[in-house]
Amino acid sequence: MSSIYLGVNIDHIATLRNARGTKYPDPVHAAEIAERAGADGITIHLREDRRHILDRDVRILRETIQTRMNLEMAVTEEMVEIALKTKPEFVCLVPEKREELTTEGGLDVVGQLDKVKAATQKLTEAGIKVSLFIDADRQQIEAAKQCGAPFIELHTGHYADAETEEEQQAELKKIAAGASYADDLGIIVNAGHGLTYHNVAPIAALPEIYELNIGHSIIGRAVFDGLEKSVAEMKALMIAARK
């Protein structure tokens, strides 16, 4: 079975810091600990409203991350320019609404194909690997292929939010089918959103999944168990699911 990688999202370290307008806890320190514990990459979402990660964080993390930076961002001119200036290893294009608590669904690539394609091409030309955060829908996967994105990240939020075992299994089947279809098209498949220590194994077991991006559940557990232990435990669960 192939390896699976963990990208740790540290947005909520910044959320905690910004709640009091202090300089601590610092996402830069969190990234260092996560990497030490086995994280294969660090994911941050620079939102247009700067509600958690700040421009300062992006700049410093770009210099200090030892693994790879995955910058999540909306498809806007401002964000594309920031990415071109920062040059992270990866950019994940995501939908964004100011009123949402967190990203609510996948990017509608079909509905804004030209816009997403233009951003993807511009970032790719700068040597940045682009991923599109989409639902496990064939049309969206095909549109991602049209855009020239080498990666997609399948939205696992509906799977994570399922209230019954039957609903969860139905969502898992959709994700599995989407991952298989994208793999057939030559797209590398990541996944994430709402994944926890209790629901990660079935997603991690899907052979096409290259990387999982997980944040909230890891940071939540870190409050009680410490960040290093929490990252290591998540990575261990993912690896065990592949055996």
Swiss-Prot record:
1-deoxy-D-xylulose 5-phosphate binds at residues 11-12, 47, 52, 102. It is found in: Cytoplasm. GO terms for biological process: pyridoxine biosynthetic process. Pathway: Cofactor biosynthesis; pyridoxine 5'-phosphate biosynthesis; pyridoxine 5'-phosphate from D-erythrose 4-phosphate: step 5/5. It is an enzyme of class 2 (transferase). GO terms for cellular component: cytosol. It comes from the Bacteria. Pfam families: PdxJ. Gene3D superfamilies: Aldolase class I. Its EC number is 2.6.99.2. Keywords: Cytoplasm, Pyridoxine biosynthesis, Transferase. GO terms for molecular function: pyridoxine 5'-phosphate synthase activity. The record marks 153 as: Transition state stabilizer. Catalyzes the complicated ring closure reaction between the two acyclic compounds 1-deoxy-D-xylulose-5-phosphate (DXP) and 3-amino-2-oxopropyl phosphate (1-amino-acetone-3-phosphate or AAP) to form pyridoxine 5'-phosphate (PNP) and inorganic phosphate. Homooctamer; tetramer of dimers. This is Pyridoxine 5'-phosphate synthase. It comes from Vibrio parahaemolyticus serotype O3:K6 (strain RIMD 2210633).
